[in-house]
Protein backbone atom coordinates (compact mmCIF):
# COMPACT_ATOMS: atom_id res chain seq x y z
CA UNK A 1 0.00 0.00 0.00
CA UNK A 2 1.41 3.34 -1.05
CA UNK A 3 -0.59 6.51 -0.44
CA UNK A 4 1.17 8.34 -3.23
CA UNK A 5 -0.33 6.06 -5.82
CA UNK A 6 0.18 3.34 -8.33
CA UNK A 7 -0.32 0.47 -5.96
CA UNK A 8 3.44 0.18 -5.46
CA UNK A 9 4.97 -0.93 -2.19
CA UNK A 10 6.34 1.69 0.14
CA UNK A 11 8.91 1.07 2.82
CA UNK A 12 8.23 4.17 4.85
CA UNK A 13 4.44 4.17 5.01
CA UNK A 14 2.29 1.13 5.43
CA UNK A 15 -0.94 3.06 5.15
CA UNK A 16 -4.20 2.07 6.74
CA UNK A 17 -4.54 -1.59 7.55
CA UNK A 18 -7.62 -3.37 8.76
CA UNK A 19 -8.21 -6.57 10.62
CA UNK A 20 -11.47 -7.03 8.80
CA UNK A 21 -14.18 -8.48 10.97
CA UNK A 22 -13.72 -11.30 13.41
CA UNK A 23 -13.72 -11.13 17.16
CA UNK A 24 -16.80 -9.76 18.84
CA UNK A 25 -17.75 -7.52 15.95
CA UNK A 26 -19.29 -10.38 14.03
CA UNK A 27 -17.50 -9.78 10.75
CA UNK A 28 -16.27 -12.73 8.70
CA UNK A 29 -12.89 -14.26 9.40
CA UNK A 30 -11.09 -15.35 6.28
CA UNK A 31 -8.64 -18.19 6.66
CA UNK A 32 -6.07 -18.23 3.88
CA UNK A 33 -6.44 -21.16 1.52
CA UNK A 34 -3.62 -22.95 -0.22
CA UNK A 35 -2.84 -21.03 -3.37
CA UNK A 36 -5.18 -18.26 -2.24
CA UNK A 37 -3.10 -15.97 -0.04
CA UNK A 38 -4.79 -13.81 2.53
CA UNK A 39 -4.87 -10.22 1.45
CA UNK A 40 -3.36 -7.50 3.61
CA UNK A 41 -6.20 -6.22 5.68
CA UNK A 42 -7.84 -9.53 6.36
CA UNK A 43 -9.87 -10.00 3.20
CA UNK A 44 -9.31 -12.79 0.73
CA UNK A 45 -6.70 -12.13 -1.91
CA UNK A 46 -9.04 -12.28 -4.89
CA UNK A 47 -8.43 -9.50 -7.38
CA UNK A 48 -12.20 -9.32 -7.85
CA UNK A 49 -12.51 -7.56 -4.52
CA UNK A 50 -10.21 -4.72 -5.63
CA UNK A 51 -12.83 -2.87 -7.65
CA UNK A 52 -15.10 0.06 -7.03
CA UNK A 53 -18.22 0.11 -9.20
CA UNK A 54 -19.63 3.58 -9.90
CA UNK A 55 -22.76 4.45 -11.89
CA UNK A 56 -22.47 6.89 -14.78
CA UNK A 57 -26.11 7.81 -14.43
CA UNK A 58 -26.47 10.18 -17.38
CA UNK A 59 -24.67 7.68 -19.65
CA UNK A 60 -26.71 4.70 -18.44
CA UNK A 61 -23.57 2.71 -17.58
CA UNK A 62 -21.48 1.55 -14.65
CA UNK A 63 -17.69 1.72 -14.36
CA UNK A 64 -15.46 -1.01 -12.95
CA UNK A 65 -12.38 0.73 -11.53
CA UNK A 66 -9.40 -1.09 -10.04
CA UNK A 67 -8.96 0.49 -6.61
CA UNK A 68 -5.23 -0.22 -6.53
CA UNK A 69 -4.23 1.00 -10.00
CA UNK A 70 -7.14 3.46 -10.43
CA UNK A 71 -7.54 2.14 -13.98
CA UNK A 72 -11.03 1.52 -15.34
CA UNK A 73 -11.18 -2.08 -16.56
CA UNK A 74 -14.73 -2.15 -17.88
CA UNK A 75 -17.83 -0.03 -18.54
CA UNK A 76 -21.21 -1.65 -18.97
CA UNK A 77 -24.71 -0.63 -20.03
CA UNK A 78 -26.99 -1.12 -17.03
CA UNK A 79 -30.36 -1.66 -18.74
CA UNK A 80 -31.60 -2.53 -22.25
CA UNK A 81 -33.16 0.89 -22.89
CA UNK A 82 -33.25 4.15 -20.97
CA UNK A 83 -31.17 3.02 -18.02
CA UNK A 84 -31.01 5.18 -14.92
CA UNK A 85 -28.35 3.42 -12.82
CA UNK A 86 -27.58 4.65 -9.33
CA UNK A 87 -26.96 2.31 -6.39
CA UNK A 88 -24.41 -0.46 -6.80
CA UNK A 89 -23.78 -3.34 -4.41
CA UNK A 90 -20.78 -5.67 -4.49
CA UNK A 91 -20.85 -9.24 -3.20
CA UNK A 92 -17.98 -11.16 -1.64
CA UNK A 93 -16.94 -12.56 -5.02
CA UNK A 94 -16.56 -8.98 -6.22
CA UNK A 95 -19.54 -9.17 -8.58
CA UNK A 96 -21.80 -6.14 -8.79
CA UNK A 97 -25.53 -5.59 -8.89
CA UNK A 98 -26.77 -2.22 -10.09
CA UNK A 99 -30.29 -0.88 -9.61
CA UNK A 100 -31.83 1.43 -12.19
CA UNK A 101 -34.00 4.01 -10.48
CA UNK A 102 -36.66 3.60 -13.18
CA UNK A 103 -36.79 -0.17 -12.64
CA UNK A 104 -34.47 -3.08 -13.39
CA UNK A 105 -31.41 -4.70 -11.85
CA UNK A 106 -28.35 -6.06 -13.63
CA UNK A 107 -25.56 -8.25 -12.27
CA UNK A 108 -22.08 -8.20 -13.80
CA UNK A 109 -19.24 -10.61 -13.14
CA UNK A 110 -16.03 -9.08 -11.82
CA UNK A 111 -13.75 -11.93 -12.89
CA UNK A 112 -13.67 -12.34 -16.70
CA UNK A 113 -13.18 -16.07 -16.16
CA UNK A 114 -16.77 -16.20 -14.89
CA UNK A 115 -18.20 -14.58 -18.01
CA UNK A 116 -20.21 -16.96 -20.19
CA UNK A 117 -20.72 -17.34 -23.93
CA UNK A 118 -24.11 -15.85 -24.72
CA UNK A 119 -23.98 -13.71 -27.87
CA UNK A 120 -23.15 -16.33 -30.50
CA UNK A 121 -19.70 -14.90 -31.27
CA UNK A 122 -16.74 -17.20 -30.49
CA UNK A 123 -14.74 -16.19 -27.44
CA UNK A 124 -15.75 -13.84 -24.66
CA UNK A 125 -16.69 -10.31 -25.69
CA UNK A 126 -16.57 -7.78 -22.87
CA UNK A 127 -15.64 -4.18 -22.24
CA UNK A 128 -11.97 -3.39 -21.71
CA UNK A 129 -12.36 0.09 -20.30
CA UNK A 130 -13.73 3.60 -20.40
CA UNK A 131 -14.41 4.03 -24.12
CA UNK A 132 -15.14 0.38 -24.89
CA UNK A 133 -18.88 0.07 -24.22
CA UNK A 134 -20.53 -2.88 -25.92
CA UNK A 135 -24.16 -2.72 -27.07
CA UNK A 136 -26.73 -4.28 -24.75
CA UNK A 137 -26.76 -8.06 -25.16
CA UNK A 138 -23.20 -8.30 -26.48
CA UNK A 139 -21.17 -7.95 -23.28
CA UNK A 140 -20.80 -11.45 -21.88
CA UNK A 141 -19.85 -10.30 -18.40
CA UNK A 142 -23.53 -9.51 -17.85
CA UNK A 143 -24.63 -12.32 -15.54
CA UNK A 144 -28.34 -11.51 -15.60
CA UNK A 145 -30.86 -8.72 -15.87
CA UNK A 146 -34.21 -8.64 -14.06
CA UNK A 147 -36.77 -6.17 -15.32
CA UNK A 148 -38.81 -4.52 -12.57
CA UNK A 149 -41.81 -2.29 -13.16
CA UNK A 150 -41.23 0.46 -10.63
CA UNK A 151 -41.51 4.16 -10.25
CA UNK A 152 -38.55 3.84 -7.87
CA UNK A 153 -36.01 0.99 -7.76
CA UNK A 154 -33.22 2.38 -5.61
CA UNK A 155 -31.84 0.10 -2.88
CA UNK A 156 -29.48 -2.75 -3.77
CA UNK A 157 -27.85 -4.85 -1.07
CA UNK A 158 -26.18 -8.25 -1.37
CA UNK A 159 -26.17 -10.74 1.46
CA UNK A 160 -22.96 -12.64 2.15
CA UNK A 161 -24.43 -16.07 1.52
CA UNK A 162 -23.15 -19.21 3.18
CA UNK A 163 -19.48 -19.65 3.98
CA UNK A 164 -17.83 -22.96 3.10
CA UNK A 165 -14.49 -23.94 4.59
CA UNK A 166 -14.18 -26.54 1.84
CA UNK A 167 -14.15 -23.92 -0.90
CA UNK A 168 -12.83 -21.10 1.29
CA UNK A 169 -15.55 -18.85 0.00
CA UNK A 170 -19.20 -17.85 0.01
CA UNK A 171 -22.03 -19.24 -2.08
CA UNK A 172 -25.75 -18.68 -2.29
CA UNK A 173 -25.64 -14.89 -1.91
CA UNK A 174 -28.99 -13.18 -2.41
CA UNK A 175 -29.83 -9.61 -3.32
CA UNK A 176 -32.22 -7.28 -1.53
CA UNK A 177 -33.89 -4.46 -3.41
CA UNK A 178 -37.06 -2.39 -3.25
CA UNK A 179 -39.61 -1.71 -5.97
CA UNK A 180 -41.80 1.20 -4.94
CA UNK A 181 -43.40 0.08 -1.64
CA UNK A 182 -42.30 -3.57 -1.87
CA UNK A 183 -39.07 -5.13 -0.64
CA UNK A 184 -37.77 -7.94 -2.86
CA UNK A 185 -35.23 -10.70 -2.33
CA UNK A 186 -33.60 -11.97 -5.53
CA UNK A 187 -31.69 -15.16 -6.28
CA UNK A 188 -28.09 -14.08 -6.73
CA UNK A 189 -27.33 -16.65 -9.42
CA UNK A 190 -30.39 -16.13 -11.63
CA UNK A 191 -31.93 -12.81 -10.65
CA UNK A 192 -35.29 -14.51 -10.04
CA UNK A 193 -37.49 -12.91 -7.38
CA UNK A 194 -37.62 -15.37 -4.49
CA UNK A 195 -39.58 -13.31 -1.98
CA UNK A 196 -41.76 -10.22 -2.04
CA UNK A 197 -42.61 -8.34 1.14
CA UNK A 198 -45.37 -6.05 -0.14
CA UNK A 199 -46.50 -2.59 0.82
CA UNK A 200 -44.22 -1.97 3.77
CA UNK A 201 -42.62 1.31 2.77
CA UNK A 202 -43.38 4.62 1.17
CA UNK A 203 -40.22 5.71 -0.67
CA UNK A 204 -37.19 3.49 -0.17
CA UNK A 205 -34.01 5.46 -0.70
CA UNK A 206 -31.37 2.97 0.30
CA UNK A 207 -30.66 -0.31 2.00
CA UNK A 208 -27.91 -2.48 3.47
CA UNK A 209 -27.58 -6.02 4.80
CA UNK A 210 -26.13 -6.93 8.16
CA UNK A 211 -23.77 -9.83 8.77
CA UNK A 212 -26.62 -12.35 8.87
CA UNK A 213 -28.26 -11.06 5.71
CA UNK A 214 -31.13 -9.15 7.31
CA UNK A 215 -32.21 -6.09 5.33
CA UNK A 216 -32.06 -2.61 6.81
CA UNK A 217 -33.97 -0.13 4.67
CA UNK A 218 -34.18 3.65 4.72
CA UNK A 219 -37.67 4.88 3.86
CA UNK A 220 -37.66 8.63 3.28
CA UNK A 221 -41.33 8.89 2.33
CA UNK A 222 -43.93 10.25 4.71
CA UNK A 223 -42.50 10.78 8.18
CA UNK A 224 -39.45 8.66 7.34
CA UNK A 225 -38.53 5.38 8.94
CA UNK A 226 -35.85 2.78 9.46
CA UNK A 227 -37.02 -0.68 8.50
CA UNK A 228 -35.70 -4.19 9.15
CA UNK A 229 -36.70 -7.33 7.25
CA UNK A 230 -35.64 -10.64 8.76
CA UNK A 231 -33.84 -12.94 6.32
CA UNK A 232 -35.37 -16.07 7.86
CA UNK A 233 -39.05 -15.33 8.48
CA UNK A 234 -39.37 -12.02 6.55
CA UNK A 235 -40.82 -10.34 9.61
CA UNK A 236 -40.80 -6.54 9.43
CA UNK A 237 -39.90 -4.02 12.13
CA UNK A 238 -39.96 -0.23 11.75
CA UNK A 239 -38.76 2.75 13.76
CA UNK A 240 -38.94 6.52 13.19
CA UNK A 241 -35.75 8.09 11.86
CA UNK A 242 -33.51 10.06 14.18
CA UNK A 243 -33.66 13.83 14.70
CA UNK A 244 -31.56 14.66 11.62
CA UNK A 245 -33.32 12.18 9.34
CA UNK A 246 -31.27 10.19 6.87
CA UNK A 247 -30.22 9.87 3.23
CA UNK A 248 -27.47 7.26 3.09
CA UNK A 249 -27.48 4.02 5.07
CA UNK A 250 -24.87 1.45 6.08
CA UNK A 251 -24.39 -1.27 8.70
CA UNK A 252 -21.34 -1.10 10.93
CA UNK A 253 -19.10 -3.81 12.41
CA UNK A 254 -21.32 -4.17 15.48
CA UNK A 255 -24.40 -4.76 13.35
CA UNK A 256 -25.83 -1.31 14.06
CA UNK A 257 -27.42 0.57 11.17
CA UNK A 258 -26.30 4.13 10.48
CA UNK A 259 -27.94 6.86 8.47
CA UNK A 260 -26.19 9.98 7.24
CA UNK A 261 -26.48 13.12 5.17
CA UNK A 262 -25.24 16.70 5.02
CA UNK A 263 -22.20 16.01 7.17
CA UNK A 264 -24.20 14.47 10.01
CA UNK A 265 -24.40 10.82 11.06
CA UNK A 266 -26.93 8.91 13.15
CA UNK A 267 -26.38 5.57 14.89
CA UNK A 268 -29.33 3.34 15.75
CA UNK A 269 -28.69 1.58 19.05
CA UNK A 270 -30.21 -1.87 18.82
CA UNK A 271 -30.33 -2.50 22.55
CA UNK A 272 -32.33 0.62 23.41
CA UNK A 273 -33.95 1.30 20.02
CA UNK A 274 -32.78 4.90 20.23
CA UNK A 275 -30.71 7.16 18.00
CA UNK A 276 -27.50 9.03 18.69
CA UNK A 277 -26.83 11.77 16.15
CA UNK A 278 -24.26 14.46 15.48
CA UNK A 279 -24.23 17.25 12.91
CA UNK A 280 -26.96 18.53 10.65
CA UNK A 281 -29.06 16.65 8.13
CA UNK A 282 -28.81 16.67 4.35
CA UNK A 283 -27.71 14.41 1.52
CA UNK A 284 -24.90 11.91 0.90
CA UNK A 285 -23.71 8.43 1.83
CA UNK A 286 -21.39 6.90 4.41
CA UNK A 287 -19.44 3.76 5.30
CA UNK A 288 -17.38 2.53 8.22
CA UNK A 289 -13.75 1.46 8.04
CA UNK A 290 -14.70 -1.88 9.57
CA UNK A 291 -13.22 -0.89 12.89
CA UNK A 292 -13.85 2.36 14.71
CA UNK A 293 -14.57 5.15 12.21
CA UNK A 294 -17.50 6.01 9.95
CA UNK A 295 -16.73 8.24 6.96
CA UNK A 296 -19.07 10.82 5.45
CA UNK A 297 -18.70 14.08 3.51
CA UNK A 298 -20.04 17.48 4.41
CA UNK A 299 -21.44 19.79 1.77
CA UNK A 300 -18.03 21.26 0.95
CA UNK A 301 -16.23 17.97 0.26
CA UNK A 302 -14.62 17.62 3.67
CA UNK A 303 -14.42 13.92 4.46
CA UNK A 304 -15.30 13.50 8.12
CA UNK A 305 -14.25 10.43 10.07
CA UNK A 306 -16.45 10.01 13.14
CA UNK A 307 -15.59 7.68 16.00
CA UNK A 308 -18.43 5.14 15.96
CA UNK A 309 -18.77 5.19 19.76
CA UNK A 310 -18.13 8.81 20.79
CA UNK A 311 -19.36 10.41 17.53
CA UNK A 312 -16.39 12.79 17.69
CA UNK A 313 -14.55 13.68 14.49
CA UNK A 314 -11.20 11.90 14.72
CA UNK A 315 -9.99 12.30 11.14
CA UNK A 316 -10.71 14.48 8.13
CA UNK A 317 -9.52 14.89 4.55
CA UNK A 318 -10.42 17.79 2.27
CA UNK A 319 -11.48 16.79 -1.24
CA UNK A 320 -11.67 19.18 -4.23
CA UNK A 321 -15.49 19.11 -4.34
CA UNK A 322 -18.56 17.78 -2.60
CA UNK A 323 -18.79 14.01 -2.87
CA UNK A 324 -22.19 12.34 -2.79
CA UNK A 325 -20.99 8.79 -2.26
CA UNK A 326 -18.40 7.61 0.25
CA UNK A 327 -16.91 4.12 0.20
CA UNK A 328 -13.95 2.35 1.76
CA UNK A 329 -11.87 -0.16 -0.18
CA UNK A 330 -10.06 -3.27 1.01
CA UNK A 331 -6.75 -1.42 1.32
CA UNK A 332 -8.22 1.20 3.64
CA UNK A 333 -8.53 4.08 1.21
CA UNK A 334 -11.64 6.25 1.48
CA UNK A 335 -13.33 7.01 -1.83
CA UNK A 336 -15.60 9.92 -2.63
CA UNK A 337 -17.77 10.09 -5.75
CA UNK A 338 -18.79 13.47 -7.07
CA UNK A 339 -22.39 14.58 -7.44
CA UNK A 340 -23.22 14.11 -11.17
CA UNK A 341 -19.62 15.04 -12.03
CA UNK A 342 -16.74 13.28 -13.79
CA UNK A 343 -14.68 12.66 -10.67
CA UNK A 344 -14.04 10.05 -8.03
CA UNK A 345 -11.39 10.63 -5.38
CA UNK A 346 -9.27 8.16 -3.44
CA UNK A 347 -8.07 9.53 -0.11
CA UNK A 348 -5.49 8.12 2.26
CA UNK A 349 -7.01 8.73 5.71
CA UNK A 350 -3.56 8.75 7.33
CA UNK A 351 -1.59 11.08 5.07
CA UNK A 352 -4.46 13.02 3.52
CA UNK A 353 -3.12 12.29 0.05
CA UNK A 354 -5.87 12.45 -2.59
CA UNK A 355 -5.84 10.98 -6.10
CA UNK A 356 -8.45 11.56 -8.79
CA UNK A 357 -10.17 9.40 -11.39
CA UNK A 358 -11.76 11.83 -13.85
CA UNK A 359 -13.45 9.79 -16.58
CA UNK A 360 -16.94 9.36 -15.13
CA UNK A 361 -20.09 10.67 -16.81
CA UNK A 362 -22.74 12.12 -14.51
CA UNK A 363 -21.57 9.99 -11.60
CA UNK A 364 -24.10 9.20 -8.90
CA UNK A 365 -23.55 6.35 -6.43
CA UNK A 366 -23.47 6.37 -2.66
CA UNK A 367 -23.96 2.72 -1.69
CA UNK A 368 -21.52 -0.15 -0.96
CA UNK A 369 -19.51 0.32 -4.15
CA UNK A 370 -16.61 -1.93 -3.08
CA UNK A 371 -18.17 -4.74 -1.04
CA UNK A 372 -16.19 -3.67 2.00
CA UNK A 373 -19.29 -2.69 3.96
CA UNK A 374 -20.80 -6.12 3.36
CA UNK A 375 -17.53 -7.77 4.30
CA UNK A 376 -17.24 -5.88 7.59
CA UNK A 377 -20.91 -5.62 8.60
CA UNK A 378 -21.60 -7.25 11.93
CA UNK A 379 -24.78 -8.74 13.29
CA UNK A 380 -26.62 -8.46 16.56
CA UNK A 381 -29.86 -9.80 18.05
CA UNK A 382 -32.85 -7.97 16.57
CA UNK A 383 -34.52 -5.30 18.68
CA UNK A 384 -37.55 -6.57 20.54
CA UNK A 385 -39.75 -3.69 19.48
Tell where the protein language model's regions lie, with residue ranges.
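Conserved beta-propeller blade signature
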Residues: 51-55, 95-99, 172-178, 184, ...
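Short loop/turn segments that connect beta-strands within beta-propeller blades
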Residues: 67-70, 110-113, 187-191, 229-234, ...
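A short beta-strand motif characteristic of beta-propeller blades
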Residues: 71-78, 142-146, 192-198, 234-241, ...
Amino acid sequence: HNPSGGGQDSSDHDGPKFDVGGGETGGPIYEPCEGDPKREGGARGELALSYIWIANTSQGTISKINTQTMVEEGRYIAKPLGGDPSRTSVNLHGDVAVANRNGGIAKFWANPEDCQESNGIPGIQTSSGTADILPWGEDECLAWYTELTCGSNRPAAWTRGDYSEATCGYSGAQLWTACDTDVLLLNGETGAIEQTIPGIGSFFYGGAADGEGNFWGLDTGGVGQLLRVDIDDFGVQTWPLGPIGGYGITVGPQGRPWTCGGGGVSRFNLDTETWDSVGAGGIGGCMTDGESVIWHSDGAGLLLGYDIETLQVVSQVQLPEYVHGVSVDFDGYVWGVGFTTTNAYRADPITGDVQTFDQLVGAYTYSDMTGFALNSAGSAPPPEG
